[in-house]
């Protein structure tokens, strides 16, 4: 039996819609896999009651099918579904890495990304690499149709998850189909700043690069209290704040010494709106690990 820990992720990061992603030190899914004649799935942990165990409807079932690797698979969810933290991607990433090793398929980590993305498509409806790439490879990733570029970055983060449900499909439906030229110019500049900040481990540049005037404002309307939480986090010292993935998690970049205060402030801001939330004081971390 193999055990794989695959991290939660934050995709988009404001200016990198459907392209940027980072692996988080915490939370994570833990998946145990053992060779078998057919695929069976058992799910426990956060939000497990909402996750189908039918292999045809579960992310890991699709991954097992793509790798022709039947197994008994136990998923312990540390990443809540519909959180904006790459819940389905974490399970798919763990399955891809684990089954690749269990069956000695010989794929590289980068080659496993599109395989895991097929699994995530079972939930989201489309195969996107921006969550599975960092969950498999770790660090900061840039996923395009040409492949994945990865950078080992070290940026402190605060991820605040409110007790609000925002489905990936709903979040995609509100994305604008067009953008003004000035918005695109600003987005390119912000994306360049964020990428440079990741290379330099510079929270200030990363935070500046998280600003977005196209997708984030549209999705913010689905998250009660987003603007208040964002403003409170910035006032507490965050260098940048945006929506993690499809939401509802709100993620902030910061200096190490400000992280605790920002976490407390974000919780309080959601509380003032009558919204319960939990917070992760985390940072950019590594990819899936096999034990």
UniProtKB/Swiss-Prot annotation:
Role: Catalyzes the ATP-dependent phosphorylation of L-homoserine to L-homoserine phosphate.
Catalytic EC class: transferase
Amino acids binding ATP: 80-90
Catalytic reaction annotation: L-homoserine + ATP = O-phospho-L-homoserine + ADP + H(+)
Pfam families linked: GHMP_kinases_C, GHMP_kinases_N
Subcellular location: Cytoplasm
One Gene Ontology term from the biological process aspect of the record: threonine biosynthetic process
SUPFAM superfamilies named among the record's database cross-references: GHMP Kinase, C-terminal domain, Ribosomal protein S5 domain 2-like
Assigned GO CC terms: cytoplasm
Keywords: Amino-acid biosynthesis, ATP-binding, Cytoplasm, Kinase, Nucleotide-binding, Threonine biosynthesis, Transferase
Pathway the protein contributes to: Amino-acid biosynthesis; L-threonine biosynthesis; L-threonine from L-aspartate: step 4/5
Name of this protein: Homoserine kinase
Cited InterPro entries: GHMP_kinase_C_dom, GHMP_kinase_C_sf, GHMP_kinase_N_dom, Homoserine_kinase, Ribosomal_Su5_D2-typ_SF, Ribsml_uS5_D2-typ_fold_subgr
EC number: 2.7.1.39
Taxonomy, superkingdom: Archaea
Molecular-function GO term, any one: homoserine kinase activity
Family affiliation: Belongs to the GHMP kinase family. Homoserine kinase subfamily.
